């Protein structure tokens, strides 16, 4: 007979092991009730490469501006103004136009109509070609437009010069965005990191050579941007045409793409409006800050907040792309339940992501604002703004994901109406009232923005919950 003194511990260990496994099982079940773990893992794995890709492409024009800014104060002001104007009047529009492919290619891939992805890509590139030509013509009147906006004549002249040499890169950027959506909707994303990082490195080297070694000075920076964007487009385009991964979705150039231009426009124009309406709202805040009392302080504060929001949104962009792809693929396959599950997971992940960003901001706000300014006044004012900024970042994270869902579903027109109403009929009037009438200044402007984003997020959420989810019929778009 076994000695109880030696047998009991073995029994206790066995029971303890069962208890431990039971606790783990209950914990796992609890987590599974809150969020689908496998879906969350898939979306996070998808999001990271998209975040890196977005950051690398975003940094191409920014690094060129940095090289130009070291030539003097006038060059800094001109390059910064030009880059801001190019973004809101051209690059953002091109990003928006490519949003049609998130619907058409995403649902087409889910429906296993693989050949049509290449057709829709070509159709979207034709649309981008036309609009890039129109925008480039518009850009040649930059100096006159800045004059009408009461900008400093010398800065306006420098900005117009910068735009002139950056204009050739716009078409390449438009084509590039279309190819990115084409790859994104097929979940072929890992190579995008390499194809975005290499052009960034090339841009840094090219800008240095053109600005300092070749002696081109100021115009060398925008020329470098244009060259790098063309390299980015041509390299990624060559990869798509030659890689075996796309043998079913890219079957060569086809005249059939012209038949789908109108269908593309019905989605791409509202998608572009979605993006631009939001971009313009932030630029309007900076403009309003500039006409307030003590414009240096107020403009600096709003600009820091806008840049912080933009950097935060780069993280959200990855989740937005994941949500758009998962939803469009599932709807294309006729799986509405799967699309809704993916949406639920995306929204929950957006809240977790926003919480992480907000914690970092609230804890390290002094160090963060110190990267932008050494002014004690600006640091103090930013400290009082940080909770408002935290609120806007959280709401923007939610709306970013819901906007991705909307693109996947083909709801671009409805979202355009929502953005127009919430930002320009609610947010901006409240911003002007709080900023000027109540004399809250920069804080008042941000309160108005929060009101706009809150109404936008709420509207998108209600639309997502109550609107009927159906597969897009391209014949009736």
Curated annotation (Swiss-Prot):
Matching Pfam families: MatE
Annotated transmembrane regions: 48-68, 76-96, 129-149, 161-180, 188-208, 213-233, 260-282, 301-321, 352-372, 382-402, 414-434, 446-466
Record's compositionally biased regions (Basic and acidic residues): 11-22
Domain of life, per lineage: Eukaryota
GO molecular function, one term: xenobiotic transmembrane transporter activity
Compartment(s): Membrane
Tissues where this protein is expressed: Expressed in the root epidermis and cortex. Not expressed in hypocotyl. Detected in the elongation zone of young roots, but not in the meristematic region.
Region (Disordered) location: 1-27
GO annotations of cellular component type: membrane
Membrane topology: Multi-pass membrane protein
Family statement: Belongs to the multi antimicrobial extrusion (MATE) (TC 2.A.66.1) family.
Its job: Required for protection of the roots from inhibitory compounds. When expressed in a heterologous system, confers resistance to tetramethylammonium chloride.
Protein name listed in UniProt: Protein DETOXIFICATION 19
Natural source organism: Arabidopsis thaliana
């Amino acid at each position: 007979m076994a000695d109880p003194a030696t047998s009991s511990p073995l029994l206790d260990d066995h029971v303890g092991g069962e208890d431990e496994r039971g606790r783990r099982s209950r914990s796992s079940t609890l987590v599974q009730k809150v969020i689908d773990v496998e879906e969350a893992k898939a979306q996070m794995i998808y999001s990271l490469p998209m975040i890196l890709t977005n950051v690398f492409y975003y940094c191409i024009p920014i690094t060129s501006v940095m090289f130009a800014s070291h030539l003097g104060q006038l060059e800094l002001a001109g390059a910064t103004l030009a880059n801001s104007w190019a973004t809101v009047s051209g690059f953002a529009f091109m990003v928006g136009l490519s949003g049609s492919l998130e619907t058409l290619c995403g649902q087409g891939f889910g429906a296993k109509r693989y050949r049509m992805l290449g057709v829709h890509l070509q159709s979207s590139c034709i649309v981008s070609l036309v609009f890039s030509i129109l925008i480039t013509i518009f850009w040649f009147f930059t100096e006159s437009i800045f004059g009408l906006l009461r900008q400093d004549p010398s800065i306006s002249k420098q900005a117009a010069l910068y735009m002139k040499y950056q204009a050739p890169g716009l078409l390449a950027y438009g084509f590039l965005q279309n190819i990115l959506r084409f790859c994104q909707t097929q979940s072929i994303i890992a190579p995008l990191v390499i194809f975005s990082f290499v052009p960034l490195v090339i841009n840094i080297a090219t800008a240095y050579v053109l600005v300092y070694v070749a002696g081109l000075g100021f115009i060398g920076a925008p020329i470098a941007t244009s060259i790098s964007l063309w390299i980015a487009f041509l390299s990624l385009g060559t990869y798509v045409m030659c890689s075996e991964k796309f043998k079913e979705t890219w079957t060569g150039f086809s005249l059939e793409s012209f038949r789908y231009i109108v269908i593309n426009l019905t989605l791409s124009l509202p998608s572009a409006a979605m993006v631009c309406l939001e971009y313009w709202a932030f630029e309007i805040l900076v403009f309003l800050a500039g006409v307030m009392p003590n414009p240096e302080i107020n403009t600096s504060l709003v600009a820091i907040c806008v840049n912080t929001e933009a950097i935060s949104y780069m993280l959200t962009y990855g989740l937005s792309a994941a949500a758009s792809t998962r939803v469009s693929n599932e709807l294309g396959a006729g799986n509405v339940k799967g699309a809704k599950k993916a949406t639920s997971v995306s929204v929950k992940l957006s809240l977790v992501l926003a919480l992480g960003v907000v914690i970092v901001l609230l804890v390290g706000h002094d160090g963060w604002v110190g990267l932008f300014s050494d002014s004690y006044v600006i640091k103090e004012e930013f400290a009082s703004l940080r909770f408002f900024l935290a609120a806007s970042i959280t709401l923007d994270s939610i709306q970013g994901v819901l906007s991705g869902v909307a693109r996947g579903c083909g709801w671009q027109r409805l979202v355009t109406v929502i953005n127009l109403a919430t930002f320009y009929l609610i947010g901006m009037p409240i911003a002007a009232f709080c900023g000027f009438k109540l004399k809250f200044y920069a804080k008042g402007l941000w309160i108005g923005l929060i009101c706009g984003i809150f109404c936008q997020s709420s509207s998108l959420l209600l639309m997502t919950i109550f609107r009927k989810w159906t597969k897009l019929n391209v014949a009736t778009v």
